[in-house]
């Protein structure tokens, strides 16, 4: 009898321990809860390049000995894009000096980007007196390869510069000159020697090569064969990062997976999606786009769901920082993709920092800050019942 009791007691203890361990043991996150990771369908060689770019982007921390500075913003790419997610007010960068008919009058004073940190013995930059400026929080990096492959024709098809349909929304592309190291896409549609740009808060970068080279040079003070000018001295110097490293980082950014919607079949999420359309949020945050041709099969002719039109929209006086880039006006901002917005707190310390400078601390606040072309959609949102607002936010958090 005692043996039976001992056996039962032992079994009970083992079951208790197993249950306790199951609660304490960390579980791997679901794939849809992660922002980083490669797009499905890469070949063995493409996976190798992705991993090489991953290491260069996230693990390589520059020092004075490896080319950092002399003035800079960050010491690595991953500093501002933790887990390939959005940045915070602690990782913002500052752009200054409004361009007018005579060009940017502050280029000789370090514009347009402020390098606010410096190596010992050097002086970091400060914003010149009288210069307009804007602070930008780093964006999430996921799905960028899909966005890069949207054709100019498709972007122009969403534009309505004269508001011909009288809906109050008149999105326009940002046209700007290309740097010497960038060749336009085969299907590019230029205007007066300028090309449609699509990356950045004001769509100031043409493609991911443009964005990456600028980040190395302006964020970290790292020269390359593509951008050999030292940001401190203004003199061309030997490259501090190799062509292959830059190209691997570009490939890494191109092949990061797109954010995966969660709980798409939830009835409240579906209802929120319908409300999103009804109050005309989708007029700018276009749900569906398609890539064109790509030598990367995983990106070639794919339909994807970023919730952006890649166009500039006038967002009103409340979001006018007095700073412009390319053909963008001071109050115009590129429609940010909404995919991944529900996962933003994972990279932002458990809370939201939305809008171009992180001023909105919730999705609700971000909506309420919309003005200009988005004023009517904001008004429609404000008139929703509390239940409908909750459904809309639930949908947005599922993206």
Regions found by a protein language model. Give the residues of each.
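Bacterial N-terminal signal peptides
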Residues: 8-16
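Periplasmic c-type cytochrome electron-transfer domains
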Residues: 21-399
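Bacterial N-terminal signal peptides that target proteins for export
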Residues: 1-8
């Amino acid at each position: 009898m005692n043996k039976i009791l001992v056996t039962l007691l032992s079994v009970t203890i083992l079951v208790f321990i197993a249950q306790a361990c199951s609660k304490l043991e960390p579980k791997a996150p679901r794939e849809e809860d992660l922002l980083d990771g490669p797009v499905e369908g890469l070949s063995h060689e493409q996976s190798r390049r992705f991993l090489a770019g991953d290491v260069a982007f996230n693990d390589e921390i520059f020092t004075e000995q490896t080319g950092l500075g002399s003035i800079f913003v960050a010491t690595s790419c991953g500093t501002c894009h933790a887990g390939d997610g959005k940045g915070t007010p602690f990782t913002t960068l500052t752009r200054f000096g409004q361009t007018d008919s005579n060009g940017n009058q502050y280029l000789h004073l370090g514009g347009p980007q402020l390098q606010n940190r410096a190596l010992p013995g050097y002086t970091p930059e400060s914003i010149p007196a009288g210069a307009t400026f804007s602070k930008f929080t780093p964006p999430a990096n996921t799905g960028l390869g899909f966005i890069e492959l949207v054709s100019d024709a498709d972007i122009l098809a969403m534009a309505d510069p004269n508001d011909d349909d009288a809906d109050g929304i008149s999105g326009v592309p940002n046209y700007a000159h290309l740097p010497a190291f960038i060749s336009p896409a085969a299907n590019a549609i230029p205007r007066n020697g300028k090309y449609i740009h699509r990356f950045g808060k004001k769509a100031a970068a043409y493609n991911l090569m443009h964005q990456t080279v600028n980040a190395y040079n302006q964020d970290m003070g790292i020269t390359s064969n593509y951008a050999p000018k030292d940001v401190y001295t203004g003199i061309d110097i030997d490259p501090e990062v190799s062509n292959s490293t830059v190209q691997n980082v570009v490939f890494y950014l191109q092949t990061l997976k797109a954010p995966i919607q969660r709980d798409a079949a939830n009835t409240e999420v579906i209802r929120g999606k319908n409300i999103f359309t009804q109050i005309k949020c989708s007029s700018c945050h276009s749900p569906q786009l398609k890539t064109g041709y790509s030598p990367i099969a995983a990106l070639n002719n794919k339909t994807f769901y970023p919730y952006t039109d890649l166009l500039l929209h006038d967002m009103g006086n409340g979001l006018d920082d007095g700073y412009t880039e390319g053909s963008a006006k001071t109050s115009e901002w590129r429609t940010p993709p909404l995919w991944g917005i529900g996962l933003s707190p994972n990279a932002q310390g458990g809370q939201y920092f939305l809008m171009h400078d992180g001023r909105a601390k919730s999705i609700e606040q971000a909506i309420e800050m919309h003005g200009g072309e988005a004023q009517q959609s904001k008004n429609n949102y404000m008139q929703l019942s509390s239940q409908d607002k909750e459904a809309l936010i639930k949908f947005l958090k599922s993206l």
